[in-house]
Amino acid sequence: MKKVLVASAIALFAGMNAQETETVGFNMGDTFITGAVGFNSQTTGDVKSNTFTIAPSVGYFVTSNVALGARVGYINSTDKNTVANVELSNEVNTFAIGAFGRYYWMPASRFSIFGELAANYANAKNTVKAGSISTDSKANGFNIALAPGINYFLSPNFALEATLGIVNYSSVKPDVDGAIATDNFGIGLDLNNISLGLVYKF
């Protein structure tokens, strides 16, 4: 019986050790998916706000250190309030599509650092309602962003990912004749711009 237990323990240890030494990280030819899914609800006074976000991304390693990819996104944001028995609401639906390139340092290790350059195009529709009266407006825009990030592999296929936006340029223009675009440029470390996600490599 003891021999069986010892043999089982050795087999278990060997399996764990093999799993630990199994290749982790990224290599040329690897494909990965990542992204964000979230829902947030907040009430401030009489105003109730809901936000739903889904933004998947897929990338492919064209070399040992460079990955190219594409992403899509959808955000629904709604604010509701009641004033003088009239229900007011402000809803924004945003659709986005973009591409990105990443350069990885130490890509074939459990822990890696990368820099990402991304460009995105977005279309937003804003619907404002006051009782039975409704007004729609649309806007188009794009942005270019530079962000450093890190990956930590929990297993050969799953990793945690964090990115921090430090440089961002955006331009938004209402979808009406004669509209003027609003440009914005920002640089700096802002902890509010940290994005966390889960990566699946296959």
Question: What does each model-found stretch correspond to?
Answer:
Residues 4-34, 103-105:
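Outer-membrane beta-barrel biogenesis signature
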Residues 19-60, 64-71, 76, 125, ...:
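Short glycine/proline- and aromatic-enriched beta-strand/turn motifs that initiate or cap beta-hairpins
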Residues 29-31, 48-54, 91-97, 138-144, ...:
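Residues that define the transmembrane beta-barrel architecture of outer-membrane proteins
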Residues 33-35, 70, 99, 113-117, ...:
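Membrane-embedded beta-strand positions of outer-membrane beta-barrel proteins
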Residues 44-52, 79-91, 124-136, 140, ...:
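Outer-membrane beta-barrel translocator domains and adjoining extracellular loop/strand segments
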Residues 59-61, 102-106, 122, 151-153, ...:
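Structural signature of outer-membrane beta-barrel channels/translocons
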Residues 65-68, 109-111, 152, 157-160:
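Repeated loop/turn-to-beta-strand initiation elements of outer-membrane beta-barrel proteins
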Residues 77-82, 149, 154-202:
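Predominantly the C-terminal beta-signal and adjacent terminal strand-loop region
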